[in-house]
Regions:
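Terminal presequence/propeptide segments associated with secretion/organelle targeting
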Residues: 17-713
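Bacterial Sec-dependent N-terminal signal peptides
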Residues: 1-22
Length: 713
């Protein structure tokens, strides 16, 4: 059978790495990846790849950390200072804030080590080495007859390999991750540091300038950075928080460039991108759009409206709910943009054309046809069989598991290990009780009632958990009356009640509480729904793995990078602007001039409110060594580096491995980037390190911190 040439060209563009700036590359095989090495040098890289990652010698990657497991960061001083985004440190800043000490609004500046603030929930993770363990993992699954048996075997050996690392050295953590839809497996060895203290945070008028309005948008003028410090024991090893700990002495300190960049300058990011679905089938993309994305859009929109109303009315609620609102709205807007971009950029049409080309290739190769003859029909049928239930599960998760905090408390209680070591029980109880500090019961009640209504409106009645029957029979269908009664009778609506409740001994007492009983009903329904589609889900898991492998065989000469999975990756490209639509061109950087323009344009909008003293400082033009060649102050810049969620706080380096800034966002026109790379549109937005240092030194009067930094000469 002859290939359809035009379709095959689309396949090449859609599913293979043909763009120099596309890809989130594994560090472990950088030296073997001659094609990537060549392209980086052609774009301007001026350092050998073994200076980027080298498990045997200090290298650039040793300065890069996973920040809390949800962001990235970079070590910039011999005393363990870490730069990350303001929105990455936002939760920590919020937890230390109060109406009297509003660090969110005013910023926080530690003048000495003694003033630096501990964050018990926070850690940083250093990557020490990676190792390909594919043969060992697949060998353990060679006798598996079903997808379930394969998964159990694979998960077991992955866990064993990881445990072997910590058994040899208790300060290390070994994690095996799957790549290429489960066709390859790599071990990553990490060392975690759990004493991480807040050192510097600019006011939100800098770190969150533009807030939701500007989120995912270019041009941008947000100084999205914060500064933390890693602490270690006296032997420079990991340690829990202690006043006796000392600043960590790093293996490698990232040098900082004050020379800036120009159009076409080489730029690379190192960080921990969360997840992408670049090789997902069109059936999976369609499910994502109509399932989890639409559920986030609908449910979070309702929940956030309840929160925002009270946040705008009360300063204490603004502080309490700032972090959770920020996290929720970030992915809410992301889902809106993703669905819009999928349609606008015709992503589904491109994927379907690519799949048609793969079908032709399979048909033209007898050995492939024998193995994969039913691949696409099986995928299509399996996705169809779980479509309705999977969509309901997405709404279920958003409405209940990520919805009212009373339910989240109850679910934690059900998972509470009362038989654990006493010290662990006390620690976990303390953490659970602390969550009440950021809860307002009247708001949570309103959220719960809204979630119950939204879920009922969006799914078939067969997906309603048992509490809806109770609402109908005992409360005449009055959801608000049910919620009022629930919150009035549950013991776990206050820290005191929860503590008293947790100190009881028997499981019988646990389920007596109406909120815990309700959560049990939710678990039962959630399990029932998942079980009903388990067979289809297994078929999809297998089908997507075979699809991925077939695609790589079809283009065996191409350089395929694996999807992001929260492991360290390198991305590279160049600094440059773009054309978002006909008649418009965006430059590759912004300056403080744009701050004044936006303040004027959005007069009265708190998203763009800036302290008069900061405006005065910026208008003075006294930028010193941080000014660009024209004497102005750059704020943000863009490159075509390939990033996603989790890359927030990633170091953006120049060709010499010197820090230019921190990645913090993507752009609205390419919000489908987790699914397909759009070379003409996709941009990584970064905050310029010179603006960061200017704010630290001139506004925050933190010259002592700037003195710690390694400025490249």
């Amino acid at each position: 059978m002859k290939f359809r040439l035009t379709v095959l060209i689309v396949f090449s563009l859609c599913l293979s790495n043909v763009f120099a700036d596309e890809g989130m590359w594994l560090l472990g095989n950088l030296r073997k990846n001659k094609q990537t090495d060549r392209v980086m040098k052609e774009l301007g890289l001026q350092m050998p790849v073994n200076k980027i990652y080298n498990p045997k010698k200090p290298s650039l990657s040793d300065a890069v950390v996973s920040f809390g497991g949800f962001c990235s960061g970079v070590v910039v001083s011999e005393d363990g200072l870490v730069f990350t985004n303001h929105h990455c440190g936002f939760s920590s800043i919020q937890q230390h804030s109060s109406v009297e000490h509003d660090y969110l609004k005013d910023g926080f500046f530690a003048r000495s080590l003694d003033e630096e603030l501990p964050n018990p929930e926070l850690y940083v993770r250093f990557l020490l080495r990676t190792e390909d363990v594919t043969k060992r993992v697949l060998s353990a699954a060679r006798y598996a007859k079903t997808e379930t048996e394969r998964r159990v075997a694979v998960d077991s050996i992955m866990n064993v390999i990881g445990l072997e690392v910590s058994e040899k050295d208790s300060t290390l953590t070994g994690i095996v991750d799957a790549y290429y839809a489960g066709n390859e497996f790599w071990l990553s060895v990490y060392r975690d540091y759990n004493d991480v203290r807040l050192v510097f945070a600019p006011p939100s008028s800098v770190g969150k300038f533009g807030w939701d309005t500007d989120n995912w948008v270019w041009p941008r003028h947000t100084g999205d950075f914060s500064v933390f410090r890693i602490y270690a024991n006296t032997k420079n090893g990991p340690a829990d928080y202690s006043p006796d700990n000392v600043p960590y002495r790093p293996e490698y300190v990232a040098p900082i460039s004050l020379d800036g960049y120009k159009e076409g300058s080489f730029c690379m990011t190192l960080g921990y991108p969360g997840s992408t679905e670049r090789y997902l089938s069109s059936y999976g993309i369609e499910e994502m759009m109509n399932g989890i994305n639409q559920a986030m859009i609908d449910v979070r929109g309702v929940k956030q409206a309840v929160w925002k109303l009270e946040m705008d009315r009360r300063p204490d609620i603004r502080i309490k709910y700032a972090s959770k609102y920020d996290e929720s709205s970030n992915y809410w807007k992301n889902s809106i943009g993703t669905n819009k971009a999928i349609k606008h950029l015709k992503v589904l049409e491109k994927k379907r054309a690519a799949e048609a080309a793969l079908r032709d290739w399979i048909q033209s190769h007898p050995e492939e046809r024998e193995k994969l003859i039913r691949l696409f029909s099986s995928l299509e049928l399996s996705y169809s069989n779980r479509r309705e239930t999977n969509r309901a599960l997405a709404y279920f998760g958003e409405s209940f598991i990520n919805g009212p905090e009373l339910v989240q408390f109850a679910l934690e209680i059900l998972n509470f290990d009362f038989e654990a070591e006493e010290k662990l029980v006390i620690t976990r109880m303390k953490k659970l009780l602390e969550k009440y500090d950021n809860l307002d019961l009247s708001i949570d009640k309103e959220v719960f009632a809204a979630m119950l209504k939204e879920y009922q409106l969006k799914v078939d009645k067969k997906y309603l958990p048992a509490m809806y029957e109770k609402i109908d029979t005992l409360y005449n269908g009055n959801i608000q009356a049910y919620v009022d009664s629930l919150y009035a009778t549950s013991n776990i609506t206050s820290p005191k009640g929860l503590k008293r409740f947790l100190e009881r001994d028997t499981t019988y007492n646990l389920i007596e509480d109406p909120a815990v009983s309700l959560s049990l009903d939710l678990i039962v329904k959630y399990y029932e729904m998942n079980q009903s589609i388990s067979e289809a889900s297994e078929q999809i898991e297998q089908g997507e793995r075979l699809f991925n492998a077939a695609m790589r065989r079809m283009y065996a000469d191409r350089n395929f990078y694996p999807d992001a999975n929260s492991t360290m990756r390198l991305s590279f490209g160049t600094v440059g602007g773009y054309t978002p639509f006909d008649g418009a061109t965006y430059d590759y950087y912004t300056t403080v001039k744009g701050i004044f323009e936006k303040v004027k344009e959005h007069a009265g909008d708190i998203d763009f409110a800036v302290q008069p003293e900061l405006l005065s400082l910026l208008s003075s033009g006294d930028f010193g060594r941080y000014a660009n060649a024209q004497g102005d102050m750059n704020v943000c810049f863009i490159s075509n580096n390939d990033i996603t969620g989790g890359n927030s706080g990633s170091a953006m380096f120049n060709a010499k491995g010197e820090l230019l800034g921190l990645a913090f966002d993507g752009n609205w026109e390419a919000m489908s980037s987790d699914i397909v790379f759009e070379p003409d549109l996709q941009r990584c937005i970064g905050v310029d390190v010179r603006y960061m240092l200017f704010i630290m030194e001139k506004y925050g009067k933190a010259g002592n911190l700037v003195q710690e930094l390694k400025i490249a000469r």
